[in-house]
Amino acid sequence: MLTYLRREWQSFGETVTIKNTFNAQEDNNQSGRKTDNRPVKTEGRYCYKADVNRSKYYHDVQGFSLGQSDLHIDPTQFIMYSGTISNGISYVNQAPSCVQLSLKFTPGNSSLIEDLHIEPYKVEVLKIEHVGNVSRATLLSDIVSLSIAQKKLLLYGFTQLGIQGLTGDVVSVETKRIPTPTQTNLLTIEDSMQCFTWDMNCANVRSTKQDSRLIIYEQEDGFWKIVTETLSIKVKPYFKAYGTMGGAFKNWLVDSGFEKYQHDLAYVRDGVTVNAHTITYVNPSGKAGLQQDWRPATDYNGQITVLQPGDGFSVWYYEDKWQINQAIYAKNFQSDTRAQGYLENVGTLKFKMNYIPAFAEIRNKPGKVNYAYLNGGFAQVDASGYTGMSIILNFVCTGERFYASDNNSRVDNKITPFISYIGDYYTLSGGDFYRQGCCAGFAAGYDDVSPEHGITVSYTVMKPSDPDFITGGENYGESITSDLEVSIRNLQDQINSIIAEMNIQQVTSAVFTAITNLGELPGLFSNITKVFSKTKEALSKLKSRKKTSPMPIAATSIIDKTTVDVPNLTIVNKMPEEYELGIIYNSMRTKKLIEQKKHDFSTFTVATEVKLPYISKATNFSDQFMTSISSRGITIGKSDIIQYDPMNNILSAMNRKNAQIINYKIDPDLAHEVLSQMSTNATRSLFSLNVRKQLHINNSFDTPTYGQLVERILDDGQLLDILGKLNPNSVEELFSEFLHRIQHQLREY
């Protein structure tokens, strides 16, 4: 079966034909249109019998400036800043005209400017003028008078150099235009710094209409139309956590993370309702808490996933009122945004232990993380109700990473608000030291969080000049990849349950089942290659989401696209690989399925992913290669048997003098060279060099000489003979290597 499946899958390919059932009614309606509305192609262009209506575009734009000025854009557009303040930030990019600005400042507990403490306040700036050598600001405030720190924070932000001398906790500002003042305390402040100047009154009043959408370039040529557009959008990332409690009594947190989540929103832009959608992809790498497999199944165990500084998340945005609809190409994405904020865990922990409510709570510490906009671009999105072009906005989590690798990290009040933990109190008794496993960041286990940002973007798209051409958009039906996402999630849950429930007794039982029942594998069935391929694809997607250490070569997997049947040039009487695959598969198959004599093909497919050691005679290595690795400090010249184990990139050699096995940790590049040397004359086997040696030394009736030991180790017939005579209870410790190998593979997903 194994050889058949391997060769069939390596040559497997298919063409999927999707029948469009979503728009059948609409297609019938389209066919009934009058031909009068159809365009007529004339000399390479589409012409209409009726007059073509052209939209009127406004040019009174609010707040956007490209990095490189476009000839179609006024490079002196006025921009206001809202967000977290840092040194160098200005609230406006130039002197405004005829405006009244409202600024609301929210400092932290220990925010300082030039070593002066800042209190929260709100002002409405009416005008700033130069009087002699000073700048004088006329404003209204929610307090009777401003402190020196509040004055400096306000006026520095209206200079070309921006804020200076800001230290301590984060300070945020919300800046916006207001039609009429609302505060009552009229104040006048002065300083020698050179500020932007303006007056709220204007002699020539411009139109008050401020459009947030502008077509700045349009060209139509034959089949295609090229459009450049500037657009203000509202973006709402959505962070939705998930998790799985596993283990014998469902008290262990075996998986957690953030879903790829589609969020729908509607907002008004220029008096028109915009139906927008965001899809949020989160890439967390942190873990809080401790993984302690020795804990009893009645106790809590497990780590919670944490989005920590240095990690990122992406927001895919699309809507129904922009030029990207029906576009097939896009370029020149630009944005002036400085969007930033923080994600903070709110609400109670979602996960519970399997006890009555009074005892089901898990001790935890919610955390948070700051983030900032990084860059943006375009992508093709295949989402619920829409297939077409979207923009991607990438954000990065900022700040300094922190993880307590032991119990000796002293508590720091500056980072404590950011700390996440699960399973116990986050500090040791006394509260002076963080508990091992504390991690700074936003944990995946609390209520949904959805911050909001206003962002201005510009882009150029190419779309059909004939509107009858459809390239995607809301007319498309449900994503054809949604079923795959569901199967991936189910597969992830299944793998997590296997990790939590596997034990050495199950592995030992699988060894002896394989010997007596030729592996006990699922039988062949119709369509097996297609099902196998789909599951392999899901496993590949799962693995791509985790940061795993690089592998030197894929051929160490039992079945992979690059795997071939391994020649039996090293081990004589080689046991069928079905035996070894059966050990792995039945170690993962649930006890209930084994008792019912039922099979789980997903588990079988996962079993084929396990990477096995390669064993070879030392004489099979070239002299040149032996000299090469000796120069790297690896001495295997006086050995008879050499093994490479992909689990930890370990090269092992059995010493000729006393049969001692010497292990060398090697890097993936050298491992690739070793495997290249072994590929034509080695044997892949679940039974490693160490397991083979221990079986023959500890379970033989005689004490073999070194020569006899080498001969027996490389003979699977004698190995199976010994296994057939053993008591399962006496070799559990020896087979713990199998358990560790399987768990190591499963944790890659």
Curated annotation (Swiss-Prot):
Signal peptide: none annotated. GO terms for biological process: permeabilization of host organelle membrane involved in viral entry into host cell; virion attachment to host cell. Keywords: Capsid protein, Hemagglutinin, Host cell membrane, Host endoplasmic reticulum, Host membrane, Host-virus interaction, Membrane, Outer capsid protein, Viral attachment to host cell, Viral penetration into host cytoplasm, Viral penetration via permeabilization of host membrane, Virion, Virus entry into host cell. Coiled coil: none annotated. The keyword Membrane applies. GO terms for cellular component: host cell endoplasmic reticulum-Golgi intermediate compartment; host cell plasma membrane; host cell rough endoplasmic reticulum; membrane; viral outer capsid. It comes from the Viruses. HAMAP family: Rota_VP4. Belongs to the rotavirus VP4 family. This is Outer capsid protein VP4. It comes from Rotavirus B (isolate RVB/Human/China/ADRV/1982) (RV-B).
